[in-house]
């Protein structure tokens, strides 16, 4: 009976990890939650094993130890969150991003009309769905993923997005061949193309079990805390997942930047781990636009401390809502007001 209980607990722990995929890293909030769940599970097992009723709880030394560990975890997490916040680290947050002033007309060269993105993401999604609807041999099995990553492909601004399985049943019937294509949209000309692959993609967000891209990455890099993944293609059209790795520069949970990048071939699942400075030239989305905007907002609003950013707001600068992209010199630039 005891062996069965132990096996059951181990299975529960394993299933919880397999489903939630927390990084084994003290900087990951999910890891702290995982530890809390483990301690609570240990308390439940201890109570059942000792057959304790609620009146015995106060007298049980073993249970007191377990609950003490739980209290330490909760207090440490709360303290770590507070001590990592901009409230007590305004200067450190303000210095996360190095900003250089420039002259727009000199720093940004004049672009030809066919290099300026005229479509936003919502418009790209409409074009992608329309293209997918015309593919009678695929439309019943696949849909277009909502990712639509903005990249610079052969000096043109394009958005790319993989197809995804229309349902779990469609995954079972098509998993052997994988996902056969991705959508590519020229953001300047509106030309929309469904690019078919010689071999299907077998590591995607819509795959299940060990072929799910998040699970695949977690088992290969158990300690890495990944930022939002983006879908890109190299200059030959090979599909990849670009997986930025977060670095926490302030306390346990604050001051997020990007330290490394993992590239995962969406067809084979092969991965390569790079430092940011060594990332291949074709990769465009090491830093997400949201992260860059957040870092600039820290720089612009925290010059005179946190409370000034909330109350007096002297000398505070913040970005306007929304942003867009420019493709310049094989790079993607984010611009906003």
Model-assigned labels for residue ranges:
Residues 2-337:
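Soluble extracytoplasmic regions of secretory-pathway and membrane proteins
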């Amino acid at each position: 009976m005891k062996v069965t209980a132990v096996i059951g607990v181990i299975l529960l722990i394993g299933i919880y990890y397999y489903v939630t995929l927390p990084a084994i890293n003290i900087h990951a909030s999910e890891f702290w939650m995982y530890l809390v769940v483990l301690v609570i599970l240990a308390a439940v097992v201890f109570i059942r094993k000792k057959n304790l009723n609620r009146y015995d709880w106060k007298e049980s030394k073993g249970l007191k130890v377990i609950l003490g560990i739980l209290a330490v975890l909760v207090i440490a997490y709360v303290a770590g969150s507070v001590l990592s916040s901009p409230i007590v680290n305004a200067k450190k947050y303000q210095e996360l991003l190095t900003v250089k002033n420039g002259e727009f007309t000199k720093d940004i060269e004049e672009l030809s009309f066919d290099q300026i993105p005229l479509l936003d993401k919502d418009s790209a999604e409409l074009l992608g769905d329309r293209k997918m609807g015309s593919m009678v041999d695929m439309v019943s099995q696949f849909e277009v993923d909502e990712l639509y990553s903005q990249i610079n492909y052969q000096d043109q601004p394009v958005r790319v997005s993989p197809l995804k399985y229309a349902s779990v049943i469609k995954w079972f019937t098509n998993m052997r061949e994988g996902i056969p294509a991705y959508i590519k949209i020229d953001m300047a000309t509106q030309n929309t193309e469904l690019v078919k692959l010689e071999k299907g993609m077998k590591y995607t967000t819509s795959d299940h079990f060990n072929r799910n891209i998040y699970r695949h990455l977690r088992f290969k890099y158990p300690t890495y805390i990944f930022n939002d993944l983006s879908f890109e293609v190299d200059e030959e059209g090979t599909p990849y997942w670009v997986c930025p790795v977060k670095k926490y520069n302030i306390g346990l949970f604050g001051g997020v930047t990007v330290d490394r990048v993992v590239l995962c071939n969406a067809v084979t699942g092969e991965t390569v781990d790079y430092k940011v400075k060594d990332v291949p030239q074709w990769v465009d989305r090491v830093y997400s636009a949201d992260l860059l905007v957040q870092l600039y907002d820290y720089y612009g609003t925290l010059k005179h401390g946190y409370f000034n950013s909330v109350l007096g707001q002297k000398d505070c600068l913040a970005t306007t809502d929304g942003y867009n992209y420019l493709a310049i010199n094989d790079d993607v630039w984010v611009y906003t007001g």
